[in-house]
Every structure is written in structure tokens, then in C-alpha cells.
């Protein structure tokens, strides 16, 4: 996705057909799924209708105020600074990401509530899911820098989800399809066919981001309805 130089991204990024609410007749429980990138995330909200998922909302939200490399790759940027300055910079980016994530999630809650929906849970896709070391060790390792950039934005979404009262389910992305197959008793091909079909009525974008976020939301909703779910912990810097 192309970035605008110096462009303010305090509001949700919008494009034709990208954000759509489907009216419903009465109150239902909904769940959000997140797939995170550097500085932004794909969000999909679903509910169940006759045990099948229905997409309620599909958005892409910015998690940085200025959508440039400096802020989208904060640990890369911090690695070029003295350690005290780097620590302050990371904290500023983290704080802003948490605020923007909360704005996005709380806004969705309000919109869905007006449609008679109760947003109560979320599914967050993880990379490795491993805890990161301190900042000094992170910026000394190029591999850890890449990992930490993504984790900062995942943690921001988790923090915001908790503030909004959502039950969070953390799912390693490489295990997502296997978990979904076991949970919904569908073969992988049939499962993905259903997810692809969900996007046909919505139009673009319905990329890998939205498809995986949908599966994460579906699993989170199932966990919430069954009274389960597991919350991600740990952090960087």
C-alpha cells in the first residue's frame, strides 16, 4: 500500500466500498478479526447467522498519525538514535498507536451498536507469539527489529481491545487454518471457499488480509460464545 508523504492519518483510511455496515433486524453478538502490518491493520467484524459467518464491517485502519517509514517502522528508526532518545521515540509511537487503535475499535462498537449488534470479542493474528527482549537487544538485531515493529502495533490493538471490553483470542497465523478446520469441522478447501464467497458481495478489497482477519474473527466469536478465549501478553522495549 502506498504511503502519502507527511499525510495525517488520524482518521480511518477510507476508500469506495471499503467500509460497509449490513443492517440487521435485532441484537446479535459480533467479533472483530485483525491482521496487522507496519502502521496499519485490516479489520473485519462478523456475526453468525444459522451458524455461518456474515461480514458486518470491513476496514483498514492506520495506527500511526503520519504514514511514513519513520513511524511505520519505529524500531528501525529508533536503531539510529541514542538509546535514551530511542526509548522516548518508541513510547511516543506506542502511545499514539494505542490511541488510534482505540478510536477505530470504539468507533466500530458504536456503529455496530446502532445496528443492534454487540461487539464483545476479537481475534488477533500473531507472528511468532514469542516475548521480545529489552530495547537494547532489539535494536542490536535486524531480525528482532522487524519482529518488534509488528509487535508494537499488535500490542496497540490488544491494549485498545481491552479498553473497549473485548475478550481477546490470540492466534498464531501459521496455525490459523488448522484451528479453523478443527473448530468448524470443514475441509480446508471448503472453509476457504466460504470465506472467499463472503467477499464477493462486498467487492475489493478482499485480499489475504481480509480473509485471514475473517477467520480470526470467526474463531474469536466461537470462543466467546463458548466462554473461552485466550489473551496475548508480553511486549517489546
Language model: regions and residue ranges:
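Phosphate- and other anionic-substrate recognition elements at nucleic-acid/protein interfaces
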Residues: 13-16, 21-230
Amino acid at each position: 500500500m502506498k504511503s502519502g508523504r507527511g499525510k495525517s492519518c488520524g482518521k480511518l483510511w477510507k476508500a469506495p466500498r471499503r467500509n460497509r455496515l449490513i443492517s440487521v433486524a435485532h441484537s446479535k453478538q459480533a467479533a472483530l478479526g485483525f491482521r496487522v502490518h507496519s502502521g496499519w491493520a485490516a479489520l473485519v467484524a462478523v456475526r453468525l447467522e444459522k451458524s455461518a459467518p456474515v461480514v458486518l464491517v470491513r476496514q483498514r485502519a492506520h495506527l500511526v498519525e503520519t504514514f511514513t517509514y519513520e513511524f511505520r517502522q519505529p524500531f528501525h528508526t529508533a536503531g539510529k538514535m541514542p538509546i535514551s532518545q530511542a526509548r522516548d521515540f518508541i513510547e511516543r509511537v506506542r502511545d499514539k498507536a494505542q490511541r488510534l487503535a482505540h478510536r477505530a475499535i470504539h468507533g466500530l462498537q458504536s456503529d455496530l451498536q446502532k445496528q443492534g449488534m454487540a461487539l464483545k470479542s476479537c481475534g488477533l493474528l500473531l507472528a511468532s507469539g514469542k516475548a521480545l527482549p529489552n530495547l537494547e537487544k532489539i535494536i542490536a538485531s535486524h531480525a528482532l527489529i522487524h519482529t518488534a515493529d509488528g509487535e508494537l502495533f499488535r500490542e496497540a490493538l490488544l491494549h485498545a481491545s481491552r479498553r473497549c471490553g473485548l475478550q481477546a483470542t490470540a492466534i498464531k497465523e501459521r496455525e490459523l487454518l488448522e484451528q479453523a478446520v478443527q473448530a468448524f469441522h470443514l475441509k480446508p478447501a471448503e472453509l476457504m471457499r466460504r470465506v472467499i464467497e463472503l467477499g464477493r458481495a462486498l467487492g475489493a478489497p478482499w485480499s489475504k488480509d481480509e480473509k485471514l482477519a475473517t477467520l480470526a474473527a470467526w474463531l474469536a466469536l466461537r470462543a466467546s460464545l463458548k466462554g473461552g478465549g485466550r489473551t496475548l501478553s508480553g511486549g517489546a522495549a
